[in-house]
A protein has these predicted regions:
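Bacterial N-terminal signal peptides
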Residues: 1-8
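Terminal, non-catalytic domain-edge segments
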Residues: 14-88, 92-107, 123-142, 149-161, ...
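Eukaryote-skewed repeat-based solenoidal scaffolds used as protein-protein interaction platforms
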Residues: 110-267, 275-278, 286-289, 293
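Membrane-interface motif at the C-terminal end of an N-terminal transmembrane signal
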Residues: 9-13
Length: 354
């Protein structure tokens, strides 16, 4: 079925045309876009960069260059700190123990799972959660840190297979591990993508879905969407459905359950995976778009949290995903220092060209 699924039938009995449906989706996206872009530079650097980078990759609009540069500065600052202060085995241990302690007092299910799974391998919090993401982002920009070799030596001291194939780690960090195994491959380091996917599927067999808590069901879905997002290098490259057929089949077969059980972030991500594969006319896209459109508070111009809170920073993730789902443009390998030099007219200290 195409995108022209009937939204409603007016009194005349004629269905609303597809073009009108598409217009309402893009109008809903514009409502959120206005809300965020009027106050974008009040957000923390990570949130500002997260939003700006995704919008730049979708549109190539130079108005997002400042937000991208904010992300660039954040990455440089992190890598400067890591190369100067967290490179020896002892430094990694002390840093990681401090990071781990941050999960101890949190009583929510996710934090407890993360603490229990990671307490015996705390270095993961440094390697996977902090270091790899910053190195991969610099790499995407066509850059690297001036101490790149030192940082790579740190990564090479550890076998990432231990984290990526551990069932308890997958239950705690599915989406993050999906990102990290693809980042490792992107950086030309260890390739544990397939062992991770195999372990993920064993950890979350479809037959066990009904036994999963809401948090664990969400973790499974996040892991699946992030396998595709990471493979696309975060909305830079199109995806071939056949390469991840098991994921697309699952989403198609379970979309109604997903709409009932999942948070808006996940629903939007599911729809975007189909857009990355060029499947805009798949019924899953229409269903996710309708669900996300209905979740928007028109007065506030954004999607609130599940508890009804309207916080720009906390809600940035779900709302930028909503914009992308409702008004999808296309994938672009951008920005890079070679192809978009104006974005990188000055580099923050520590970053150099590859």
């Amino acid at each position: 079925m195409g995108l022209a699924i009937t939204l409603w039938l007016p009194a005349s009995g004629y269905a609303e045309p597809a073009s009108t449906t598409n217009n309402t989706f893009s109008e809903s996206a514009e409502l959120i876009r206005q809300t965020y872009e009027e106050q974008l530079f009040t957000l923390p650097a990570f949130k500002e960069g997260h939003y700006g980078l995704r919008m730049y990759r979708q549109t190539l609009d130079p108005k997002y260059s400042a937000a991208v540069w904010s992300d660039l500065a954040r990455v440089a600052s992190r890598l400067n700190q890591f190369s100067a202060e967290v490179s020896t085995a002892e430094q990694v241990f002390l840093y990681s123990e401090q990071r781990l302690a941050g999960y101890f007092d949190d009583a929510d299910e996710r934090s407890q799972l993360r603490y229990i799974a990671t307490k015996h391998m705390p270095e993961y919090l440094y390697l996977g959660v902090d270091l790899l993401g910053s190195m991969a982002r610099a790499n995407e920009y066509g850059l690297k840190h001036k101490e790149d070799q030192l940082l790579r030596q740190v990564i090479r001291r550890y076998d990432f297979t231990k984290y990526a194939t551990d069932e308890e780690m997958i239950k705690a960090w599915a989406a993050q591990l999906a990102n990290q195994v693809y980042w490792l491959r992107q950086l030309g380091e260890q390739d544990v993508v397939q062992p991770f996917i195999d372990s993920f599927r064993k950890t979350y067999p479809d037959s066990a879905d009904k036994a999963l808590s809401a948090q664990q069901y969400g973790n499974k879905l996040y892991g699946m969407t992030h396998i595709i997002f990471a493979d696309s290098e975060y909305y830079q490259n199109p995806i071939k459905e056949q390469q991840h057929q098991w994921i697309f089949d699952y989403f198609r077969n379970n979309i109604d359950t997903i709409l009932l059980r999942a948070k808006e972030d996940v629903v939007a991500e599911v729809g975007i995976t189909f857009l990355l594969a060029g499947l805009e006319k798949d019924p899953v896209v229409e269903k996710t778009r309708l669900a996300i459109q209905q979740a928007i508070d028109k007065k506030k111009g954004m999607i609130p949290s599940t508890s009804g809170v309207f916080d720009l920073a906390d809600g940035e993730h779900r709302n930028v995903l909503a914009i992308m789902l409702l008004d999808w443009q296309k994938t672009n390998q951008a920005p890079t220092v070679k192809n978009n030099p104006k974005v990188f007219s000055s580099l923050p200290y520590g970053l150099i060209r590859q």
